[in-house]
């Protein structure tokens, strides 16, 4: 099979510098890896024990693809008790991870040519996910001197008639920065004003 049988978007992939960085990192001694948020800590013994008990009790098979009824109810209860928000079971879905959930969300909301705003530094898959969903990534900066907080005026300047959503990454990967309550409120106000996801 030759490469031209692949979808055109995969025939000439962009260079992925992460592979080169990974190879270089492996050649270094005593390097602290901050790339994927995978700590070198052993999982808490209580979690290990509970997982083992669940496996021994027969919880080793596939569950419902959108999440078990017990899980969905736990999510509903959490959002009610913590944030006083009400959700119906049909509004809650489980995914295999945050990247999977993000990609499914982008597929659900993005039409070809829609612009999706992401703030940099950003988790490297975000740009690709937006493009694979048919969207156009619009990258805006955040700055170390501001604690990597998203500035409302910079966000406003990036919005166009094609803007569909703003990706919020807090705590941020890779910086670890957490948006302040004030920053979140400004983003929410702008999103409501412009009818953005």
Model-derived features with residue positions:
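Conserved PLP-anchoring active-site segment centered on the Schiff-base-forming lysine
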Residues: 108-130
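Short acidic capping loops at alpha-helix termini that bridge into adjacent secondary structure
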Residues: 86-92, 112-115, 162
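Active-site phosphate-binding strand-loop segment of PLP-dependent enzymes
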Residues: 138, 143-197
């Amino acid at each position: 099979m030759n490469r031209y049988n692949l979808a055109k978007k995969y025939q000439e992939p962009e260079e992925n510098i992460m592979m080169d960085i990974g190879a270089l990192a492996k050649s270094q001694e005593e390097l602290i890896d901050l790339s994927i948020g995978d700590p070198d800590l052993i999982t808490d013994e209580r979690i290990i024990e509970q997982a083992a008990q669940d496996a021994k009790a027969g919880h080793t098979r596939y569950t419902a693809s959108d999440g078990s009824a017990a899980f969905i109810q736990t999510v509903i209860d959490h959002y009610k008790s913590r944030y006083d928000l009400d959700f119906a079971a049909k509004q809650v879905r489980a995914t295999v991870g945050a990247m999977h959930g993000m990609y499914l969300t982008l597929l659900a909301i993005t039409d070809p040519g829609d612009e999706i705003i992401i703030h940099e530094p950003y988790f490297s898959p975000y740009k690709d996910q937006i493009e694979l969903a048919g969207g156009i990534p619009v990258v805006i900066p955040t700055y170390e001197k501001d604690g990597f907080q998203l500035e409302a005026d910079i966000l406003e300047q990036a919005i166009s008639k094609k803007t569909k959503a703003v990706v919020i990454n807090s705590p941020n990967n890779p910086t670890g920065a957490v948006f302040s309550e004030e920053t979140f409120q400004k983003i929410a106000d702008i999103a409501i004003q412009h009818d953005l996801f």
